[in-house]
Amino acid sequence: MKERTIQPVNNGLNGNITIPGDKSISHRAVMFGAIAEGTTTIKGFLPGADCLSTISCFKEMGVDIVQNGDEVTVVGKGLEGLQEPKAVLDVGNSGTTIRLMSGILANTPFFSCVQGDASIAKRPMKRVTNPLKQMGANIDGREEGTFTPLTIRGGDLKAIEYTSPVASAQVKSAILLAGLRAEGVTAVTEPHISRDHTERMLEAFGVKVTREGKTVKLAGGQKLTATDVQVPGDVSSAAFFLVAGAIIPNSKLVLENVGMNPTRTGIIDVLEKMGATFTVEPINEGASEPAANITIETSSLKGIEIGGDIIPRLIDEIPVIALAATQAEGITVIKDAHELKVKETNRIDTVVAELTKLGARIEATDDGMIIYGKSALKGNTVNSYGDHRIGMMLAIAGCIAEGKTIIEDAEAVGVSYPTFFEELQKLAK
């Protein structure tokens, strides 16, 4: 376990930063390119551990993929061209890979076995395997397909109209991807609208997708046609520097090419409501995935209540929002965030435990947390528990803590932001 020592940042964070490619879009670009007809070129790809796991799995199924830094070429096999893997498909730490790929494997007439690391082994798969089984896929795993490893024997599927108990883009996407080769029209209805990268990208690859309120539909039998994909910066990665810019004294940051998909910009809405000083300059209006340059500077924040429909739009940003709340005047309440319990760690528990070690006044609730601002943080030894977003949040916390902060298991940040610590160091000079 590698550790990192973070010293207080006395002169603020200043400068321009180009945010690495969006993880969600990078995964999908590789997967959709693999099952499309023709060659897909991806620019702005995120070469983090999770997305490299996706490349590795599809190579194992006979897809020709060449990756050179943030540029990837995928020679598509079409929906029916994937080959039965000779080895176990290892997704590493990537929940997106295992859940979306399960949808593709469910409609493919061969046998596969899918597993990941210790964190993946604890994450619930039944939310995906149950609807796929209803469509006709043969799936098994520990505790009747609840946990990995999963075995999948795909084949002829029938479309379903599925009402998901959770607002999850991974669940929705798995069902829609299975539906590409299912007989009939597949429909997924969610309690709240989740991120819509799958729908946008399927349309870019030539698939007709219908959206009606909280329901998404597609007809089986549609082919994907290769296209070039430009991946914007990941707003979830940008969130750490947005909060850093707001809470570290004497800071002014310009974040370039940040993805502004409206199903992902809850963090922007929350910072605005908390009183942060920032500007958003759109740079590619009309694109399938909008992007902007964001300038943010040190701000006086106030506590707010966060819950309801906005939660799926910022679920991954809650750890760093909690940190921002420790520096806000008043109380911040985060609720309706049960999904935090089934992330890389139980993020309710880890956020509360680690911020408490730094002197924050924060308490866990069943579906979120309550943060009492404003807290003066003090350096301590903390742990990411292998969770990239916890690791990065703690690094930003260390920048405003008195004395040094030691982060154990700091290399976890490489899952989504391999250059995070280098960028942080550069901006602090």
Curated annotation (Swiss-Prot):
Compartments, record wording: Cytoplasm
Binding positions (3-phosphoshikimate): 23-24, 28, 168, 170, 316, 343
One Pfam assignment: EPSP_synthase
Active-site residue list: 316 (proton acceptor)
EC top class, as a word: transferase
Molecular function, one GO term: 3-phosphoshikimate 1-carboxyvinyltransferase activity
Pathway field: Metabolic intermediate biosynthesis; chorismate biosynthesis; chorismate from D-erythrose 4-phosphate and phosphoenolpyruvate: step 6/7
InterPro entries found in the cross-reference section: Enolpyruvate_Tfrase_dom (IPR001986), Enolpyruvate_Tfrase_sf (IPR036968), EPSP_synthase (IPR006264), EPSP_synthase_CS (IPR023193), RNA3'P_cycl/enolpyr_Trfase_a/b (IPR013792)
One GO term of the biological process aspect: chorismate biosynthetic process
Residue sites binding phosphoenolpyruvate per the record: 23, 95, 123, 170, 347, 389
UniProt superkingdom: Bacteria
Function: Catalyzes the transfer of the enolpyruvyl moiety of phosphoenolpyruvate (PEP) to the 5-hydroxyl of shikimate-3-phosphate (S3P) to produce enolpyruvyl shikimate-3-phosphate and inorganic phosphate.
Record-linked PANTHER family: AROM/DEHYDROQUINATE SYNTHASE (PTHR21090), PENTAFUNCTIONAL AROM POLYPEPTIDE (PTHR21090:SF5)
Record's protein name: 3-phosphoshikimate 1-carboxyvinyltransferase
Natural source organism: Bacillus cereus (strain AH820)
